[in-house]
């Protein structure tokens, strides 16, 4: 092949993979976008030493534009508007608004970004464009300023706001779920390592406005394969499922100083995780579909939950209080500690624990308002109860017993230390066939 032939091939390859219409079309095909493309050099001036200067508004005309690799967008008075912008390691230099109704895709290098960088976020799922500027390979700070932001599930199982590794997200505003009829969706999903979601903002689900009747998995915040993560200070309410769901082998999780109200299924579910702390939270008005507990520690089949601490948690007007259950398939619950909590239940047991290796219950106020047991423990290998104050209207004051179930063999409770728990009724070695 002569030099001209080689040169032709090189030029063709550059054209295919660069940000021209053909390259953009290939990019779109890879992620299933149906949108016309525009070449970046037709809407932007040529980069000057890797910098694209935006002095006047750039209208993408509702088309998709791929930026060249590694450029910096320097905003000096103008914004980019109306379309889809695909970054490729793109940096931003700006002290004001940058985008106006622009969908953000691709990869970016923006260590600090905010809703203030977007001129208009008055459209559903606009926050997905804000968090799309984050790069999981570098530390990110994302500020969601005061204001109302709507999110909308587009299909069953949709994630409205995905948060990835190395992100600090400060929520000051209110996120509202648009009513839908889906069985499951996730307003925010934390997936990755080293994530903080904090602030004094609010997340509101569609419990009272949901248009369907099936399902129970409309989650406010979900942890999925999340490690070294925390959620603090937030208000989360009216979720079709759980306000918070900790799942899929997450670890080193902190949920602190949050106010959870009117979860339909649970306040918090912990279904697959290790090293979880829930501290200083207030959980109220949980009810609508079973199990209806403030906190439910209940691993799915073949999953493990271990080393959970519930501390200084206040529960009021919930159908059930705290539930610990390790009886699903080959599920296992390791150690659960409950300390300095104020727990009240309007119907079910205030504290119910079944098939747990170690349960430590110390210095709690436990109240039962409807005739069920204050505390019911079954098949706990190591149980410690100290300095708890229990109150009840009628029925069993405290019920601690063996529970023998053929599927799990003869696991018997071993009472190690129960003291200062007031009037206590203990029934040992009682068998029950199910």
Task: Put a short name on every predicted segment.
Residues 53, 59, 66, 74, ...:
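Extracellular beta-strand solenoid repeats
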Residues 116, 171-174, 193-204, 227-238, ...:
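Right-handed parallel beta-helix
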Residues 1-5:
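Positively charged n-region of N-terminal signal peptides that target proteins for export
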Residues 6-14:
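Sec-dependent N-terminal signal peptides
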Residues 13-25:
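Bacterial Sec-dependent signal peptides at the C-terminal "C-region" and cleavage site
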Residues 59-71, 81-96, 128-137, 150-170, ...:
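Extracellular beta-strand-rich solenoid/capping regions of secreted or surface-exposed proteins
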Residues 26-55, 116-145, 150:
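Acidic Gly/Asp/Thr-rich repetitive segments characteristic of extracellular carbohydrate-active
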Residues 62-63, 82-86, 139, 153-154, ...:
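Short glycine/acidic-rich loop motifs that flank beta-strands on beta-rich extracellular proteins
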């Amino acid at each position: 092949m002569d030099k001209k032939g080689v040169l032709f091939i090189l030029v063709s390859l550059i054209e295919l993979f660069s940000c021209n219409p053909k390259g953009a079309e290939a990019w779109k095909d890879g992620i299933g976008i149906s949108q016309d493309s525009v070449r970046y050099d037709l809407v932007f001036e040529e980069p000057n030493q890797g910098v694209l200067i935006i002095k006047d508004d750039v209208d993408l005309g509702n088309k998709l534009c791929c930026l060249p690799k590694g450029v910096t967008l320097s905003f000096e008075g103008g914004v980019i508007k109306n379309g889809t912008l695909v970054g490729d390691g793109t940096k931003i230099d700006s002290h004001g608004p940058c985008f106006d109704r622009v969908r953000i895709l691709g990869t970016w290098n923006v260590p600090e970004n905010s809703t203030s960088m977007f001129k208009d976020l008055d459209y559903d799922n606009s926050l997905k464009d804000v968090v799309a500027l984050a790069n999981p390979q570098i530390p990110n700070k994302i500020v969601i300023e005061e204001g109302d932001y709507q999110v909308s599930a587009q299909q069953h199982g949709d994630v409205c706001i995905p948060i990835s590794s190395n992100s600090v997200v400060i929520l000051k505003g209110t996120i509202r779920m648009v009513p839908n009829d889906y069985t499951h969706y996730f307003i925010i999903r934390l997936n990755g390592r080293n994530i903080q979601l904090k602030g004094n903002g609010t997340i509101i689900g569609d419990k009272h406005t949901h248009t369907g009747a099936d399902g129970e998995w409309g989650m406010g915040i979900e942890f999925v394969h999340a490690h070294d993560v925390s959620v603090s200070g937030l208000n989360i309410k009216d979720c079709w499922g759980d306000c918070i769901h900790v799942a899929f082998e997450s670890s080193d999780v902190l949920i602190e100083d949050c106010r959870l109200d009117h979860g339909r299924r649970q306040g918090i579910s912990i279904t697959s995780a290790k090293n979880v702390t829930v501290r200083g939270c207030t959980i109220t008005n949980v009810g609508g579909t079973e199990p209806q507990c403030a906190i439910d520690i209940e691993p799915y089949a073949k999953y493990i939950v271990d080393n959970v601490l519930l501390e200084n948690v206040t529960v009021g007007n919930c159908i059930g209080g705290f539930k610990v259950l390790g009886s699903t398939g080959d599920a296992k619950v390791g150690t659960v500690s409950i300390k300095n909590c104020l727990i009240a239940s309007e119907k079910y047991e205030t504290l119910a624990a079944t098939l747990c290796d170690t349960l430590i219950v110390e210095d709690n106020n436990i109240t039962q308002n409807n005739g069920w047991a204050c505390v019911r423990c079954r098949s706990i290998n190591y149980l410690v109860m100290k300095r708890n104050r229990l109150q009840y209207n009628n029925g069993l004051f405290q019920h601690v017993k063996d529970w023998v179930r053929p599927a799990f063999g003869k696991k018997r409770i071993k009472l190690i230390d129960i003291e200062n728990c007031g009037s206590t009724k203990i029934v040992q070695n009682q068998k029950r066939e199910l």
